[in-house]
Swiss-Prot record:
HAMAP family (alphabetical): DXP_reductoisom
Amino acids binding 1-deoxy-D-xylulose 5-phosphate: 125, 151-152, 186, 209, 222, 227-228, 231
Residues of the signal peptide: none
Protein name (database record): 1-deoxy-D-xylulose 5-phosphate reductoisomerase
Cofactor: Mg(2+); Mn(2+)
EC nos: 1.1.1.267
Amino acid sequence: MKKITILGSTGSIGINALSIIQKNPDLFKVIALVANKNFSIMLRQCELFSPDWVAMRDEKSAHILRKKLKHSKINTQVLTGEKDICALAALEETDHVISAIVGMAGLLPTLSAIHAGKTILLANKESLITSGYFFMKALSSSGAKIIPIDSEHNAIFQVLPLEIQKNLGKTTLEKNSIKHLVLTGSGGPFYKFSSSDLSNVTPDQACSHPNWLMGKKISVDSATMMNKGLEYAEARWLFNALESEIKILIHPESIIHSMVQYYDGSLLAQLSVPDIRTSISYAMSWPDRICTEVDYLNFYKINNLTFFEPDFTQFPCLKLAIDAFSQGQASMTVLNAANEIAVSSFLDSKISFTKIYEINMEILMSSCFSEPKCIQDILEIDRKVRILAKNKVSSLIF
């Protein structure tokens, strides 16, 4: 039985992971759950899964949860704050940690789990793209393992040789007869929109993905295709891939989740209906597979599968992320922080959709940071850039 801690249990990934655990109680046991401040969902999760521990980042929410658990006579211990969250990520009794906290808030807890030698089921891409060198170095020295949850990286993982699966980031693609990886992306809800149309889209429109049910932040990132740029960076680190070894392809139907081109001419792909439970369940059960309630792919109902090259003019955030990766970890940290503030401001209706790119570009172009020498340097860059980005948003409002 695998003993699980979920970082970000009240979000989309966490809720879906718990639904898989609920269907497979003989395979998984929940040891600890972590969330930000959604105490009502956390209360329900405690009632259903009886974790030994939970941690809420928000102290007020933790206080409310303690009262409600006591009233319900549930013995789960409630902790609060980042220090306690990191402690739960490294619990001795846990062997698998699902890293699903959104954004840079997931960095330190994920690193804590890595240093403790856990198997990390990674959905929090921000922790890897901003601190890839330190992340992979810690992974190597601790003996921890990493399995990606993102549908694209999970799809690639599924069709890789076992040698790479067991040693992500430690071996080259070329040594395993791989010519390149193909990251697919739907193009989001706006891939047919004109530039003038994009300036008027609403947060609700941006969060209405045609194929996937996701959280708000990642939905907006999908709409700008920043998400694909971040996934490009994630793939570079995870699979130790060179720039020439990654291709990006727009695939609006979201049936082929990614592909691996081998030197012998074989192109291996992972196909399924667009349901994140497929990749979550594979990550949780690897190297085995388990039954899920995901519908099977029916080829008779698929009219056609289409593919396009990405248009960097229409999706400049994608190009911005690819270029930032080539500039180093400081640039990726700057871009990630600026984007988190810009997306949050758009969701709060403070800025227009097209301003997301403008803010990202201006902050990235105007920032000049030395390459980080440690995690603390990355956190400091992140802190300073968030201030710059918030000031930029304020200047656009007033």
